[in-house]
């Protein structure tokens, strides 16, 4: 690389490319946050359901969700044991309290992941604001020179 300074146009191009990269990364993080939120909601529902089941009597008739807002009638055969997914498509039977603790631990981990992603997103947004300000300065500089129709949108 030579020692001479870059032209404002080249600086602007580089800043625009960097801005677009940050923007794509931010969009990806926002999508990831959406998935994390859905997972957290599912965990919250499971924890709540296990809590409600522990208060139900064996043999009690209840409505069980079967998907798409549809339910089936069922009788509770055991309130003290539930089947939980442990990952990799594997589900195991656990005591209800142990299952709740496992789900709470997952929920806590999900919350921590969400916090870290939000922190990363805030840093990206700060960088994007810094780049935007630099582009606006370059645009003003180019307009003073009379050589630009503008490039900041």
Swiss-Prot record:
Q: Which domain of life is it from?
A: Archaea
Which family does the UniProt entry place this protein in?
Belongs to the prefoldin subunit alpha family.
Lineage of this protein's species? Archaea, Methanobacteriati, Methanobacteriota, Stenosarchaea group, Methanomicrobia
**MF GO annotations:** unfolded protein binding
Q: Which GO terms describe its biological process?
A: protein folding
InterPro entries found in the cross-reference section: PFD_alpha_archaea, Prefoldin, Prefoldin_subunit_alpha
Q: Subunit structure, briefly?
A: Heterohexamer of two alpha and four beta subunits.
This protein is called Prefoldin subunit alpha
Q: Which GO terms describe its cellular component?
A: cytoplasm; prefoldin complex
Keyword list (alphabetical) reads: Chaperone, Cytoplasm
Subcellular location as annotated: Cytoplasm
Sum up the protein's function in the record's words.
Molecular chaperone capable of stabilizing a range of proteins. Seems to fulfill an ATP-independent, HSP70-like function in archaeal de novo protein folding.
């Amino acid at each position: 690389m030579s020692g001479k300074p870059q032209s404002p146009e080249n600086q602007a191009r580089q800043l625009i490319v960097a801005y677009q990269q940050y923007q794509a990364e931010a969009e990806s993080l926002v999508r990831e946050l959406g998935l994390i939120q859905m997972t957290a909601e599912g965990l919250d529902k499971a924890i709540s359901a296990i809590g409600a089941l522990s208060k139900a009597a064996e043999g009690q008739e209840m409505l069980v969700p079967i998907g798409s807002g549809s339910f089936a009638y069922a009788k509770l055969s055991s309130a003290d044991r539930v089947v939980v997914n442990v990952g990799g498509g594997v589900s195991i039977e656990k005591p209800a309290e142990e299952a709740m603790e496992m789900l709470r631990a997952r929920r806590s981990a999900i919350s921590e992941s969400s916090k870290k992603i939000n922190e990363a997103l805030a840093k990206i947004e700060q960088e994007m604001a810094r780049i935007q300000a630099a582009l606006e300065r370059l645009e003003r500089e180019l307009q003073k020179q009379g050589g630009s129709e503008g490039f900041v949108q």
